């Protein structure tokens, strides 16, 4: 069986340790020869790299090569897979996005609203430059992109690399939601198969099927979830803001009686309520910096000081979180041509036959060694079509603004966003966001 070479782009990320653990767990199905960590933040990556040395010595001794580097040629040359998870500006810029949005009376969120717009205009140039570099050194490698905001990034990669079917854009949020459903049902997520349509962070489950029996659990789940439930899943989702998000799902299910919504729809359907719940002095970015990110690096530093994982409380388990599972499972499906079903962000091309053909939709797809094959969704009701067309117009204009350096397109994008709408507010937001993002955004004229 072939052994693959992979590069984790964003090697210093707090998500990387779980990804490395998942690669250990998956080594029989997805054997590796070489793992490269690439990041432009050498200090953070040094910590992850030293942790990786200990991890692989104990759990993956047959791995031939592990390196970490800030040099693109060294990182990207002759790789089979690039797993991308970059955050342009890191969490400090996310904090600015959220607090500037709240200052102007809009909700402050990472990927939605004005915060997501700002993040998108930082991410797109960085992702495009990295993909061009990867293609210089490994023209045929698979690029599996997790970088947020995934909807805007996917729209940009479609335009700049229109015929590159080996670029696949994904998001783990629907899978995280399915973990909740599985826990409610007393099942495992891998026992379930979703039918789903929408845009990234903007979609609906129409069926939750039992893979063995074909039973559709959606009606049962809707009834259960009309009342908030406290479900124990991975530690990240036990944080206060995530618990609040999952609890609010019951509000959406009671108000809209057809499907099961992606949790991010709370920001678009109840923007004032979401804004009023937020603390303008301490946002989700602060919570992450003080919580999960800090804890992740503290854990790695402790392992490095111990020099081992075996025989400590940090012993590797099979529970690594959906973020790591999803991208490694996707790479495994491509490598082994399994034709498994994944939720992928892909060009519509008639998959949903009554929305724009060029729309970047998030739908179930079969995935194998030839790439992604979307499964037909058909027509969707007017309410969902209207929401999606409006949101996609915002996403398109955001990418236009970035690639063309157009202030007018940026203003139009923000006014179309359901969390902003007001032109005067959008102008003030843009003024502050342009100032905050100097050095990250392409200049707007």
From Swiss-Prot:
Keyword set, alphabetical order: Glycosidase, Hydrolase, Manganese, Metal-binding, NAD
Binding site for Mn(2+): 171, 201
Paired cysteines (S-S): none
GO molecular function: hydrolase activity, hydrolyzing O-glycosyl compounds; metal ion binding; oxidoreductase activity, acting on the CH-OH group of donors, NAD or NADP as acceptor
Comment on bound cofactor: Binds 1 NAD(+) per subunit. Binds 1 Mn(2+) ion per subunit.
Gene induction: By maltose and methyl-alpha-D-glucoside.
Enzyme nomenclature, EC number: 3.2.1.-
Gene3D superfamilies: Lactate dehydrogenase/glycoside hydrolase, family 4, C-terminal (3.90.110.10), NAD(P)-binding Rossmann-like Domain (3.40.50.720)
Keyword tRNA processing appears in the UniProt entry: no
Protein name (Swiss-Prot/TrEMBL): Phospho-alpha-glucosidase PagL
Encoding gene, per UniProt annotation: pagL
């Amino acid at each position: 069986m072939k052994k693959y070479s992979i590069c984790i782009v964003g090697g210093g990320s707090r998500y990387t340790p779980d990804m490395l653990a998942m690669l250990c767990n998956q080594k029989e199905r997805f054997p590796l020869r070489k793992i490269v960590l690439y990041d432009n933040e050498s200090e953070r990556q040094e910590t992850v790299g030293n942790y990786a040395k200990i991890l692989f010595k104990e759990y993956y001794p047959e791995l031939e090569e592990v390196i970490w580097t800030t040099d693109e040629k060294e990182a990207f040359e002759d790789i089979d897979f690039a797993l991308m998870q970059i955050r342009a500006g890191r969490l400090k810029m996310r904090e600015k996005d959220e607090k500037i949005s709240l200052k102007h009376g809009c909700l402050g969120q990472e990927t939605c609203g004005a915060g997501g717009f700002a993040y998108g205009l930082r991410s797109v140039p960085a992702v495009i430059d990295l993909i061009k570099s990867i293609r210089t050194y490994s023209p045929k490698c698979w690029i599996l992109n997790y970088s947020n905001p995934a909807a805007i990034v996917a729209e940009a990669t479609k335009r700049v690399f229109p015929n590159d079917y080996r670029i696949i854009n994904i998001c783990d949020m629907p899978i995280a939601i399915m973990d909740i459903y599985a826990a409610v049902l007393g099942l495992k997520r891998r026992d379930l198969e979703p039918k789903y349509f929408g845009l990234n962070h903007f979609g609906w489950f129409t069926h939750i099927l039992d893979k063995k029996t074909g039973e559709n659990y959606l009606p049962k789940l809707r009834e259960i979830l009309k009342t908030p439930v406290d479900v124990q899943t991975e530690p990240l989702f036990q944080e206060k803001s995530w618990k609040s998000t999952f609890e609010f799902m019951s509000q959406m299910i009671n108000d809209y009686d057809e499907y099961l919504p992606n949790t991010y729809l709370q920001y678009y359907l109840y923007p004032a309520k979401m804004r009023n719940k937020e603390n303008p002095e301490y946002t989700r970015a602060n919570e992450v910096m003080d919580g999960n990110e800090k804890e992740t690096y503290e854990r790695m530093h402790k392992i490095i000081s111990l020099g081992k994982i075996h025989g400590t409380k940090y012993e590797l388990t099979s529970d690594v979180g959906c973020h790591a599972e999803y991208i490694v499972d996707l790479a495994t499906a491509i490598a082994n041509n399994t034709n498994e079903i994944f939720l992928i962000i892909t060009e519509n091309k008639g998959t949903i036959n009554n929305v724009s053909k060029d729309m970047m939709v998030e739908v179930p797809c079969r995935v194998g060694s030839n790439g992604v094959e979307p499964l037909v969704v058909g027509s969707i009701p007017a309410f969902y079509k209207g929401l999606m067309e409006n949101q996609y117009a915002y996403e398109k204009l955001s990418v236009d603004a970035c690639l063309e350096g157009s202030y007018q397109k940026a203003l139009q994008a923000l006014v179309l966003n359901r969390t902003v709408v007001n032109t005067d507010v959008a102008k003030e937001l843009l003024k502050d966001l342009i100032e905050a993002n100097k050095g990250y955004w392409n200049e707007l004229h």
